[in-house]
């Protein structure tokens, strides 16, 4: 209250009242009662009440909800696991496609698109295309495979019972149980796919309840149709096939003459060694420029880009050492597959060498795309010192690769035809070899 009195003491009356600070006497100059101007006064509030203070003997503690901290960590772990699973599924899928005639171009097209996208954006993470979608499709396939395991077991038991006691009651019971399990398994797979096809839906036995409720709301058919159609379009199969075919034709156009001359060097003719040597020199020269040219085709999405020789030289001048690293990685990662071609691989296991091919070539494509993107985003060439020193790894690495390729015709199962199996730029198993 003392503060309020002090505040009023500073206010001057509107008529006839003088206030002397710090004095109690008021001297009136007019007999009329003084009129004071009313001003708002902010009362000092007491200190806000503290939170409820627990008794000293209380054992309660204010602890944050642990779920708030656990849930983000769990989501991050599941997201990383889903990405890794999708990447593994993607590699296996590309390996299977690479071992199949004609469909090989889908695998090659994906590898070129991955490198081309990195070249356009300059970011390596953009080369991992469709990993989440691959995880979704891989979960669907894995769920169907898990559901079919009991069915295969019962089928084997029914077959064994039929062999032991043909026409007996035990064999008939197993056969009836097999048909019942087939119906239930098919129904469960259908309900899991109708709900979304995630892996967890295959492990949940009551999907039919959700499907019935969704059907009662209406519009399920049109929604499911649109989702399936959008998923099929997102795969971009015609685009990958077209890009892979054009990448194959462009690379083969550069390789066919040097490889043919190298193969002719094996003939029993006087000039055959010279022809083979000329083919080896031309092949080494082509190998120096072909990774950049083929990646330019993927980046520009046109076949004529694979013949833009001068543009490839300009790109090299802007990022010489990046191209050198990508070139060494491309040829070095292509060597392991030659070891797998020494022995004939059965058709059923043809995807295993393809898996080795995809595992090694995919990083090489990403590095080549990254080097091209680095060159595109630079306006001026690098210093002459880096340009000339960046050329040093090309000649010895290309010469060593040509030497290894020349001797593969004596170790490979396909003989001289193995010279045309340039899987560093073509498909892992050539189309004519199937």
Tell what function each PLM region has:
Residues 6-11:
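Short polybasic linear motifs
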């Amino acid at each position: 209250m003392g503060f309020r009195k002090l505040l009023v003491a500073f206010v001057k009356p509107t008529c006839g009242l003088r206030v002397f600070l710090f004095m109690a006497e008021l001297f009136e100059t007019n007999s009329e009662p003084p009129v004071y101007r009313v001003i708002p006064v902010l009362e000092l509030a007491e200190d806000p009440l503290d939170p409820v203070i627990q008794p000293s003997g209380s054992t309660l503690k204010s602890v944050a909800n642990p779920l708030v901290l656990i849930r983000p960590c769990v989501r991050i772990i599941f997201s990383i696991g889903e990405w890794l699973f999708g990447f593994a599924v993607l590699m296996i899928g590309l390996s299977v496609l690479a071992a199949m005639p004609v469909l090989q171009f889908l695998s090659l097209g994906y590898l070129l698109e991955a490198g081309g996208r990195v070249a356009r954006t300059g970011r390596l993470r953009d080369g991992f295309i469709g990993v989440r979608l691959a995880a979704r499709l891989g979960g669907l396939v894995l769920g169907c495979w898990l559901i079919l395991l009991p069915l295969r077991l019962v089928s084997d038991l029914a077959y064994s019972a039929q062999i032991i006691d043909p026409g007996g009651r035990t064999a008939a019971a197993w056969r009836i149980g097999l048909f019942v399990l087939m119906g239930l398994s098919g129904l469960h797979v259908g309900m899991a796919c109708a709900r979304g096809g995630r892996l967890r839906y295959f492990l949940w036995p009551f999907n039919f309840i959700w499907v019935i409720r969704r059907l009662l709301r209406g519009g399920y058919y049109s929604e499911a149709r649109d989702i399936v159609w959008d998923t099929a379009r997102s795969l971009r199969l015609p685009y990958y096939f077209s890009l892979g075919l054009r990448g194959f034709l462009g690379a083969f156009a550069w390789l066919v003459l040097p490889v043919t001359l190298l193969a002719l060097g094996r003939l029993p003719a006087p000039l055959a060694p010279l022809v083979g040597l000329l083919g080896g020199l031309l092949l080494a020269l082509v190998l120096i420029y072909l990774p950049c040219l083929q990646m330019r085709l993927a980046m520009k999405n046109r076949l004529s880009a694979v013949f833009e020789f001068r543009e490839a030289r300009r790109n090299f001048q802007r990022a010489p050492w990046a191209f050198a690293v990508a070139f060494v990685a491309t040829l070095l990662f292509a060597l392991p597959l030659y070891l797998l071609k020494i022995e004939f691989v059965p058709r059923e296991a043809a995807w295993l060498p393809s898996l080795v091919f995809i595992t090694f070539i995919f990083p090489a494509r990403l590095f080549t795309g990254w080097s091209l993107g680095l060159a595109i985003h630079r306006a001026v060439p690098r210093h002459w010192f880096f340009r000339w020193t960046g050329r040093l790894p090309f000649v010895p690495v290309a010469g060593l690769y040509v030497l290894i390729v020349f001797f593969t015709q004596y170790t490979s199962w396909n003989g001289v035809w193995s010279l045309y199996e340039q899987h560093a730029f073509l498909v892992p198993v050539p189309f004519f070899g199937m």
